[in-house]
Amino acid sequence: MRQDLTGTPRFFRLTQGYPGRAHSAVNTLHRSVLLEETIVGLQVHPGGLYLDATVGLGGHSEAILRTESTRVVALDQDEDALAQARLRLAPFGERVRFEHINFAEFEPGEERFDGIVADLGVSSMQLDSPERGFSWRFESPLDMRMDGGGEAETAADLVNTCSAEQLSDLFWRYGEERFSRRIARRIVERRPLRTTTELAAVVASAIPTRQPIHPATRVFQALRIAVNGEVAALETFLERSPDWLVPGGRLAVISFHSLEDRPVKHRWRADPRLEVLTRKTITAGEAEIQSNPRARSARLRLARRLSPSEESRS
């Protein structure tokens, strides 16, 4: 369902991109979903300061920066994505500042923002990079770390060391996989597993063949969420981010599955600092879905930071 929450006329088309060779190369890799709806929902205005908590390849930041004198603080824990965003947003110079950090660990200091956007989940660039191990479509090591390195556990570590009970719980909790027990037992029988294709084949062998999606999709999602601590990071962000806004400032969060959307919905409803602006989630129209299939599962929620006087009356 598409909603116009502001009464604003249809926003100018944002999909043409900022002119320049660097941008066009990046833009072929990734198109930000619900871009127009996000910018309208944030009520981006000249001179505003905005936080892009998951800059990715820079699509939402670029759209914000097209408004005169706006500034953006752009965060990402993925160094590769941050490097691409730097290229894309280079024409905006000092109006954008980059930080290599997970949004749950961000410290704004004295800065307060007119709007915050977080586009959750994995970007198309990450999914299409074989060496990252996020997708069953490519032969690669079972890594799945968003930061691309460090000492954190990899997906291979979890697959090869967790008990069948632990794996089953992980696949059910983070992937909502109804065949979690069967898959976990088969993995324990066949391990060690070192590559994405090995894991995908083992999962496929454990469950019925007729599935609406690839049989390994939910298992890969669950492992990615566990490896990167995504649930805990999102909970921390949802708790802290309202305090980063000026009174009247807006939050926009785009999620791609219920494990992301559910905490946003319930946290915001219970938060006395916020007014929820979206009774139902905003979803992509058919035209966007046709041009960008990733948009089909995207859900946008919006909230507004209450002023102290509004909080006292609520």
Curated annotation (Swiss-Prot):
Lineage, top ranks: Bacteria, Bacillati, Cyanobacteriota, Cyanophyceae, Gloeobacterales
Entry-linked Pfam families: Methyltransf_5
Entry binding sites for S-adenosyl-L-methionine: G58, G59, H60, D76, F103, D119, Q126
Subcellular locations according to the entry: Cytoplasm
Family label: Belongs to the methyltransferase superfamily. RsmH family.
Cellular component aspect of the GO annotation: cytoplasm
Gene3D superfamilies: Putative methyltransferase TM0872, insert domain, Vaccinia Virus protein VP39
A Gene Ontology molecular function term of the record: rRNA (cytosine-N4-)-methyltransferase activity
Chief place where the protein resides: cytoplasm
Protein name as it appears in the record: Ribosomal RNA small subunit methyltransferase H
Keywords: Cytoplasm, Methyltransferase, rRNA processing, S-adenosyl-L-methionine, Transferase
Disulphide-bridged cysteine pairs: none
The gene coding this protein: rsmH
Alphabetical GO biological process terms: rRNA base methylation
Reactions catalysed according to its record: cytidine(1402) in 16S rRNA + S-adenosyl-L-methionine = N(4)-methylcytidine(1402) in 16S rRNA + S-adenosyl-L-homocysteine + H(+)
Keyword Transmembrane helix found: no
